[in-house]
A protein has these predicted regions:
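Structural recognition of an alpha-helix C-terminal capping motif at a helix-to-coil junction
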Residues: 56-63, 67, 80-96
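Amphipathic alpha-helical segment used for protein-protein interaction
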Residues: 121-161, 167, 178
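Short, well-structured alpha-helical segments
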Residues: 42, 54-62, 150-154
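A short, charge-rich alpha-helical start-of-domain segment used by transcription regulators
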Residues: 2-9, 20-46, 66
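Internal acidic/polar
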Residues: 8-11, 100, 108-134
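DNA-recognition helix of helix-turn-helix
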Residues: 95, 99, 162-195
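Arg/Lys-rich amphipathic alpha helix in sigma70-family domain 2
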Residues: 47, 71-74, 91-113, 125
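Hydrophobic/aromatic residues within well-ordered alpha-helical segments
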Residues: 33-37, 41, 61, 90, ...
């Protein structure tokens, strides 16, 4: 089946090919993609919006994706092992949904760090520590990076290539690389000085 790695490339490309061949229904393919990317979608939103809104906004992202996925055109993007059209679509949709929410809310009421620390109580010590450190790093990035750098940083951390990020944000790959380097430099400088 899909998850057995009989086909080459990322899971999403194998799912898209199986769906195009009629081996998977739209719902079965959606379920696999949801399991693969739900944490990434939530993490993208966690950096952008208050923690109380994440679940609702993630649901909005997935509803938008589901509607689009049922009409998905299975084209050349499935042939490249580097391209991940689903991840790119989810990234753009997260940006759109989060910005719409920000325009309505105009304020952040809680910090993702607090929520990560609350959830940390139930995990093993190493994963708890990694989760808290990641939440702190993302919170710092949100404070010190301009929005356009934060967009690139989040996409790169999720594993998107510079080409995918460039296409998603309608910028050049050189600009993606520049913004990514600038975001990392800001974070390093802030960490050296102390947050």
């Amino acid at each position: 089946m899909i998850e057995a790695k009989e086909d080459s490339g990322p899971l999403e490309n194998r799912v898209l090919r199986a769906r195009a061949r009629g081996e998977l229904s739209a719902d079965a393919a959606f379920e696999i993609l949801f399991r693969e990317y739900r944490r990434i979608v939530a993490s993208w939103l966690a950096v952008r919006v208050e923690s109380a809104a994440i679940d609702d906004l993630a649901q909005d992202v997935w509803l938008i994706f589901y509607g689009r996925f049922r009409r998905w055109e299975f084209g050349a993007e499935m042939e490249s092992t580097e391209a991940r059209p689903v991840l790119s679509f989810l990234f753009r949709t997260c940006q759109f949904v989060a910005r719409g929410h920000q325009r309505l809310a105009r304020s952040r009421r809680s910090d993702p760090i607090e929520e990560a620390e609350e959830r940390a109580v139930s995990g093993d010590p190493q994963s708890v520590l990694r989760g808290v450190e990641a939440a702190r790093a993302l919170s710092l990035a949100r404070r010190v990076c301009p929005e356009e750098e934060l967009d690139v940083l989040l996409a790169k951390l999720a594993g998107m290539s510079a080409r995918e990020v460039a296409q998603a944000l309608s910028i050049t790959e050189a600009v993606v690389d520049h913004r990514y380097r600038d975001a990392l430099a800001r974070l390093r400088a802030k960490l050296r000085v102390g947050s």
